[in-house]
Amino acid sequence: TGLAYEVVPVYHEDAAGVNTEKMYRNITERWRWGGLDKVTKKGQVYLDETVRRMLSSNRGAIFDLARCLGVEAYNAKINPASVIYGNLPDSVEVVAQLTDAEQAKVDKYVSDRVKKIQTLLKLQQDKLPEVAMDYTFIEYDQLCKIYDLLYEITGDKQYQEKCLSLLETELNRFGKFMQYYESLPAPLYNSLSSQDLMIVSYYPYLIRQYYKYSGMDQKKTENLLRSLEKKYKFS
């Protein structure tokens, strides 16, 4: 549905988790924003724990919708007949070539989804900016997956570069933490908080994601690692 969960006694494996049309309309036309778009520098406003949770939930809702729109577009690209005939049972195989008019309908469908994703990402960036509150681990991961999906759909390198840029930002953000952790003697390292230990495990994950989203470009990934090691003096 739009933003709420519906409890219904029916399950269907083809049913999407998000009603993309309704939710897109709700977010772009019906949401009332709280003024965070006026924030121009970090620390300008104080956000308490409750507000931060709400902000994160709203970002997550936008990213969930963007991802679902991306999945719809991707599925239309790999199975264009689904746009024309709907989701057919696996036992039914469509072998007919699409007409020019049908292909145009598929292209329009994919383009519509891509434009909606772009609108959502711009809206999130404007109304819930990172300068007001840093992205969480999960939000960075969601954003990277969305940009990678856009790259898969369109083949446009700008989306891949944006994805890799986000990962580089995160790696630099936590590079100084890794430098500090490696400097600790064993007793102090063993006393690190769960949050610190999460960063320790998160860092290698970011590197793996960079390698994956770069198209498994080993040279590009190795160059990044050398740059990080030189900058933050960790191994």
Give a label for each model feature.
Residues 1-235:
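ER/secretory pathway lumenal C-terminal domains and tails of membrane proteins involved
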